[in-house]
Amino acid sequence: MDYPPLKGAALAWVTLSLGLAVFMEVLDTTIANVAVPVIAGNLGAATTQGTWVITSFSVANAVSVPLTGFLAKRIGEVKLFTAAAAGFVIASWLCGIAPNLQSLVVFRILQGFIAGPLIPLSQSLLMASYPPAKRMLALALWAMTVVVAPVLGPILGGWISGNWHWGWIFFINIPIGIISAWITWKHLKHRETATVRTPTDYVGLTLMMVGIGALQMMLDRGKELDWFASGEIITLGITALVCLSYFIVWELGEKYPIVDLSLFKDRNFTVGAIATSLGFMVYMGTLTLLPLVLQTNLGYTSAWAGLAAAPVGILPVFLSPLIGRFGNKIDMRLLVTASFLTFAFTFYWRTDFYADMDIGNVIWPQFWQGVGVAMFFLPLTTITLSHMKGGQIAAAGSLSNFLRVLMGGVGVSVVSTLWERREALHHTRFAEHITPYSATLHETAAHLSQQGISDGQTLGIINNTITQQGFIIGSNEIFLAGSILFIVLIPIVWLAKPPFHSGGGGH
């Protein structure tokens, strides 16, 4: 069913409400990360147990996102979005009052599952509310919230956990979610999408939930359990491989599939989804690595690490609306190419990190990386959805967002593991030069002994210095690899075929 575009104040309010929901959901994926030690300690649990606060949300969210297209057809996009925003409020309140870790994990599972439809439906409803000529501007405003929220998450999480009860990490969602749900329902309840009652593909649903759940669990817990040295990780990996392989075969032959894999027959959707997922994998991996380097090796507090990383969100706030307004005059592939080149340049800029560098070495690459971020989400989303019509937008949005989030998790897991293993390699190589016959060792020991430091303490200081250097060199190598990967990704984007327009129709 087609509706005329919204105008004036109604369009502004809907844009605000949909943007708030996206901001709330994306913020919640990162805000708890820095607060895990505080939450675990307050609830009488070990920090390693506290990581389930993050894992539970990501697993439930990963399972839920691909269901969006299926649920939207049965319930209606407006009802589903409003219910998800309202449900997120309730789940956030429950998380904030959780009396123990077990309850918090259960409520985070609920919160993650409910949050699944918010991002893909915000795309679909936003595009249906704007006239075709202005849909790129709508996507630009949407992309701006996706960029800023994960940057603010660690800063807010660290500040709240350091100054208030950790429950406020979740309570801040309550007014945002209420406003979003109320405004959306008020302005869009008469613009509900058509619903279709089709048989439920229970086999596909079960295979997808088990397969994706096992895969996300493997990614979240792999580093902690030393990957495939652990029987649990092997079991999760085999479960994910078998279930997802069978899921793909089953869905391709199913008349009423849970996930419409036929979307991959569209060239632009496939190219856009692949480029977005792989680019986001590299981006998220390094975005997570930077605060770790700053806190564990360069002596930054969590608050200062968050502030040092924050400049990446400055330029997108100003550039995204401009790209949305004038981007339809430029080939989307050129914008993505410029984005990937900017990422490659700023990543290479970081390959000379050293132990006593000042904060400017961190801030300036982050600041200019914002140019790449501004030209990343909007053009790639436009390419991905360029041939989608009406109800296909929600299904395509949910599938592409699922792949993006999944590959972002892969990036975080791979980068954190590589970082530790590169440190171990460099530590071993440096330690080989510390022998009883080493002139450097004797000079260092003599210098430290003059300051009243014992031989045992001297060896400890040297070991810590080697560890610090190993981690810094490891991070420099990862940034270099990220720079190369972004260059390699550029040809993929040029496989997309113009014309590019932001979705093919309304509802």
UniProtKB/Swiss-Prot annotation:
The keyword Transmembrane applies. GO terms for molecular function: transmembrane transporter activity. Disruption phenotype: Mutant is hypersusceptible to long-chained fatty acids such as palmitic acid, oleic acid and linoleic acid. It holds the Pfam family MFS_1. It is found in: Cell inner membrane. It is a multi-pass membrane protein. InterPro entries: EmrB-like (IPR004638), MFS (IPR011701), MFS_dom (IPR020846), MFS_trans_sf (IPR036259). The chain crosses the membrane at residues 8-28, 52-72, 78-98, 109-129, 136-156, 164-184, 199-219, 233-253, 274-294, 303-323, 334-354, 363-383, 399-419, 478-498. Keywords: Cell inner membrane, Cell membrane, Membrane, Transmembrane, Transmembrane helix, Transport. The keyword Membrane applies. Induction: Expression is positively regulated by MtrR. MtrR acts by modulating the expression of the regulatory protein FarR, which directly controls the expression of the farAB operon. Gene3D superfamilies: MFS general substrate transporter like domains, Multidrug resistance protein D. One of its GO terms (cellular component) is plasma membrane. Mediates resistance to long-chained antibacterial fatty acids (FAs). Function is dependent on the MtrE outer membrane protein. PANTHER family: MAJOR FACILITATOR SUPERFAMILY MULTIDRUG TRANSPORTER MFSC. Probably part of a tripartite efflux system FarAB-MtrE, which is composed of an inner membrane transporter, FarB, a periplasmic membrane fusion protein, FarA, and an outer membrane component, MtrE. Belongs to the major facilitator superfamily. EmrB family. This is Fatty acid resistance protein FarB. It comes from Neisseria gonorrhoeae. The gene is farB.
